[in-house]
Amino acid sequence: MKPLRLIAVGQVRTPYFREACAHYLTAVRRYLPAEEILARDGKSADPARRKAEEAKAVLAALAPRDFVVVLDEHGPSLPSTELAALLKKRIEDPGRAPAFVIGGPFGLDKAVLDRADRLLALGPGTLPHELARVVLYEQLYRAASINAGAPYHH
């Protein structure tokens, strides 16, 4: 089984969000192998340039055969059970590892969006990127627990 790959731009700097991410990443790993890959933050003050810098790091972290799910406010949101089905299908695909990508404070460059096999929103609202990372990790834990038949999701 190929590991679930979580590719995120930058470190989580807020302590309680960092702790929550670590908690849910550990929880995900109870059910399936998962790795977190941190893409370097862009340094430019210009948002477009910064996203382009970050895109290079994100694209370098992706393997050619990854099934890339990019978090984007314009993507559809999925109920937890549908996310579980998507995760199960991707985990069971021997050729393509699932890779979830979450951007930094300015979002993701078009080059990353173009690389996506699927876009995914966490809901109709916009979340700060650190909170979005926590929510994604929790939803992936919930999806993995649904697939394992665990009682976390009622």
UniProtKB/Swiss-Prot annotation:
Chief localization: cytoplasm
EC numbers on record: 2.1.1.177
UniProt keyword terms in alphabetical order: Cytoplasm, Methyltransferase, rRNA processing, S-adenosyl-L-methionine, Transferase
A GO molecular function held by the record: rRNA (pseudouridine-N3-)-methyltransferase activity
Record's subcellular location: Cytoplasm
UniProt xrefs under InterPro entries: Alpha/beta_knot_MTases (IPR029028), RlmH-like (IPR003742), tRNA_m1G_MTases_N (IPR029026)
GO annotation, cellular component aspect: cytoplasm
Highest taxon of source: Bacteria
Catalytic activity as recorded in UniProt: pseudouridine(1915) in 23S rRNA + S-adenosyl-L-methionine = N(3)-methylpseudouridine(1915) in 23S rRNA + S-adenosyl-L-homocysteine + H(+)
Protein biosynthesis recorded as keyword: no
Pfam families, sorted: SPOUT_MTase (PF02590)
Positions contributing to S-adenosyl-L-methionine binding: L71, G103
Family statement: Belongs to the RNA methyltransferase RlmH family.
Protein's job: Specifically methylates the pseudouridine at position 1915 (m3Psi1915) in 23S rRNA.
Assembly mode: Homodimer.
Protein name as it appears in the record: Ribosomal RNA large subunit methyltransferase H
Gene that encodes the chain: rlmH
